[in-house]
């Protein structure tokens, strides 16, 4: 089932083109990775989908609803975990989750907070202040917070940036579980290993344009110079954006 559709989305600030004629769809339970150099438009696209920003033109449908006209209807169906920790720093993890659950009027919120704390294995540090959390703990807590409202779509901006490899792998496992729950995910990332491990499809952006969107192996095949070349996703990506390493 299709949960998201972008049709000719354009974003411009004064004379600067941020996004140009972006069109793609997202299916239920699908994980899509947005790849592109800095300034490619990845975060701008996430903000438009989340409702934090608006396109100048184009159509955005979320769960079959026109997001520009009826955003309130889909607000609880969409979660957005930003790169920076924006949780209430003076609260403990549990307090922050309870606060958010009450704010969004989650039914049986105390039970659901306990359940998600257990699900994300946060029991031993649920009473720790947000400001005292490590990067990996904070990222887990933010993803858990977003899932309290049971969104159909989750947006993750650089979900494992700055984390140690072992912690990064733990975050990946949590993201993989979302797919099994039928949640559709869009991530932005600079890690090719992360994109290849997590994503069903990859979208490559450069200067606001969508250069390609397809399965990882097909993306590699498109940029393969001959059938005997052992091409990595990183090499394919660099060829797409015109910066192949020698």
Kindly give the residue locations of the regions a language model identified.
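Conserved ABC ATPase "signature" region
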Residues: 98, 102-125
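Conserved catalytic motifs of ABC-family nucleotide-binding domains
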Residues: 150
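Catalytic Walker B motif of ABC-type/P-loop ATPase nucleotide-binding domains
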Residues: 154-157
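ABC ATPase "signature
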Residues: 213-214
């Amino acid at each position: 089932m299709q949960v998201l559709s972008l049709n000719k989305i354009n974003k411009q600030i004064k004379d600067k083109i941020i996004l140009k004629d972006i069109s793609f769809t997202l299916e239920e339970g699908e994980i899509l990775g947005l790849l592109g150099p800095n300034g490619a438009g990845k975060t701008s696209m996430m903000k438009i989908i989340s409702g934090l920003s608006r396109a100048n033109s184009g159509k955005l449908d979320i769960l079959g609803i026109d997001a520009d006209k009826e955003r309130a209807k889909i607000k609880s169906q969409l979660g957005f975990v930003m790169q920076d920790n924006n949780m209430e720093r003076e609260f403990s993890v549990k307090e922050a989750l309870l606060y958010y659950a009450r704010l969004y009027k989650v039914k049986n919120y105390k039970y659901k907070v306990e359940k998600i704390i257990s699900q994300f294995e946060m029991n031993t540090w649920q009473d720790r202040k947000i400001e005292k959390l490590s990067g990996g703990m904070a990222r887990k807590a933010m993803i858990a917070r977003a899932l309290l409202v049971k969104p159909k779509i989750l947006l993750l901006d650089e979900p494992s940036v700055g984390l140690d490899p072992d912690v990064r792998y733990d975050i990946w496992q949590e993201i993989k579980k979302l797919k099994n729950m039928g949640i559709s995910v869009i991530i932005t990332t600079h890690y090719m290993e992360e994109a290849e491990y997590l994503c069903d499809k990859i979208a490559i952006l450069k200067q606001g344009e969508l250069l390609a969107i397809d399965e990882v192996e097909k993306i590699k095949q498109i940029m393969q110079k001959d059938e005997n070349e052992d091409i990595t996703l990183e090499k394919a990506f660099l060829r797409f954006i015109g910066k192949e390493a020698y």
